[in-house]
Regions:
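Short, amphipathic alpha-helical interaction segments positioned at domain boundaries
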Residues: 70-92
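Short acidic, hydrophobic short linear motifs in intrinsically disordered regions
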Residues: 20-33
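Contiguous, function-dense segments enriched for cysteine-driven chemistry
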Residues: 1, 7, 26, 65, ...
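Short, Lys/Arg-rich nucleic-acid/phosphate-binding segment
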Residues: 58-64, 68-69
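Short amphipathic alpha-helical interaction segments
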Residues: 36-51
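A short, conserved structural fragment
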Residues: 50-60
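Short alpha-helical segments that sit at the start of domains
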Residues: 1-21, 77-78
Length: 92
């Protein structure tokens, strides 16, 4: 799994500053991101963040943000588990 790019982190941050963990729709998100990104880029990043688990799709074009700390925990857990296994193998 690749880590997030700067653009994706910035989009998450801008949405977080505006909505925190409240529900929002695509139009509201696009309005928030309009000064910085095109509609195409904004939609692409929102879909990607949704796929990765940083944005929950609530159906009917409604979304909510997932706490970044929770995302880091879920992402790093698998990484740390894998590193631990590899480290044990190399240490013999």
């Amino acid at each position: 799994m690749r880590w997030l790019k700067k653009r994706e982190v910035v989009v998450y941050y801008l949405l977080y500053r505006k909505f925190r963990f409240d529900k929002f729709n695509v139009g509201e998100a696009l309005d928030t991101l309009k000064p910085y990104f095109s509609k195409k880029v904004s939609m692409s990043v929102i879909k990607y963040l949704s796929k990765k688990g940083l944005i929950n799709s609530l159906g009917n074009s409604k979304y909510s943000l997932v706490p970044f700390e929770e995302f880091l925990y879920l992402t790093s857990y698998e990484y740390i588990k894998r590193r631990s296994t590899l480290r044990r193998r190399t240490r013999g």
